[in-house]
Amino acid sequence: MQTRKTFSWIKEQIARSISVSLLIYIITRTSISSAYPIFAQQGYENPREATGRIVCANCHLANKPVDVEVPQAVLPDTVFEAVVRIPYDKQLKQVLANGKKGGLNVGAVLILPEGFELAPTDRISPEMKEKIGNLSFQSYRPNKKNILVIGPVPGQKYSEIIFPILSPDPATNKDVHFLKYPIYVGGNRGRGQIYPDGSKSNNTVYNATAAGIVSKIIRKERGGYEISITDPSDGRQVVDIIPPGPELLVSEGESIQFDQPLTSNPNVGGFGQGDAEIVLQDPLRVQGLLFFLASVILAQIFLVLKKKQFEKVQLAEMNF
């Protein structure tokens, strides 16, 4: 009996441990996956400034390319693909928050014209779903369905991101018209250098906050350094804290200048932005164009037939 109770207690403890582990994993994964878009969403009402600059560039300081591809024209109430490409060397490793090296992640923000939005799941074809994979998109704001964000997601798998977009219908939305519209995109690979509060991450270069002699370098137990800089004129000492990740460039006894780099720049990523244009095409205009082309083709056919008939008449008159 005692053995049975003990076995039952062990099973209960194992089940509880598994539940706690799963909960911690879910919470951690959620916080990581939503971190980057939340930085912009919490700090800015609109991700695109009046100057045209996308706010992600405030934290991701290096400039890198990004490309967006959309159809030249779409019909109303149609699902189409917006393809965002974030190219980078897949062999590169970035500095993680704990100072270790790991793969790069990517993220993107897609700013569509008013009325365009993420396509509902039931409107997305199986072929498009296969291209999208396990990506989960979200609106920048509940009232800004035309602005979509994604990331961070593993760059090895998602350096090309497919956004399923639903075009608006002017027949049901009077604020939308059959016009040419701009589309803006921003894409980053790797971690940022600045946090929204203005503090540095460990994915950037650290500079000396004072001039003087490097009097002491203490390597911290969990990584990183404490660098003591002494002013030889008055003996005043300043301590610069270096987090785990960047490589140290100075040594004890070295004379340094104010703002001189103390570390290398570990950043291998960067942010880029681009734009494209799309035409919301009027179906009646397309039908009119098709009718016009058909009439031109028919006119050409009749002209050829008429010419052949005229040649036959001429030939008959010559024989007569």
From Swiss-Prot:
Give the species this sequence originates from.
Answer: Jasminum nudiflorum (Winter jasmine)
Q: Which cofactor does it need?
A: heme
The GO cellular component terms are: chloroplast thylakoid membrane
Where is it predominantly found?
Answer: plastid
Q: What does this protein do?
A: Component of the cytochrome b6-f complex, which mediates electron transfer between photosystem II (PSII) and photosystem I (PSI), cyclic electron flow around PSI, and state transitions.
Molecular-function annotations in GO: electron transfer activity; heme binding; iron ion binding
Give me the gene this protein comes from. Answer: petA
Q: Name one GO biological process term.
A: photosynthesis
Keyword list, A-Z: Chloroplast, Electron transport, Heme, Iron, Membrane, Metal-binding, Photosynthesis, Plastid, Repeat, Signal, Thylakoid, Transmembrane, Transmembrane helix, Transport
Task: Kindly list the places in or outside the cell where this protein is found, as annotated in its UniProt entry.
Answer: Plastid, Chloroplast thylakoid membrane
Q: How does it sit in the membrane?
A: Single-pass membrane protein
The cofactor binding remark recorded in the entry reads: Binds 1 heme group covalently.
Record field: transmembrane: 286-306
Family note: Belongs to the cytochrome f family.
Residues annotated for heme binding in this entry: Y36, C56, C59, H60
Give the signal peptide, or none: 1-35
Database matches in PROSITE patterns: CYTF
Highest taxon above the source species: Eukaryota
Q: What is the protein's given name?
A: Cytochrome f
Q: How does it assemble?
A: The 4 large subunits of the cytochrome b6-f complex are cytochrome b6, subunit IV (17 kDa polypeptide, petD), cytochrome f and the Rieske protein, while the 4 small subunits are PetG, PetL, PetM and PetN. The complex functions as a dimer.
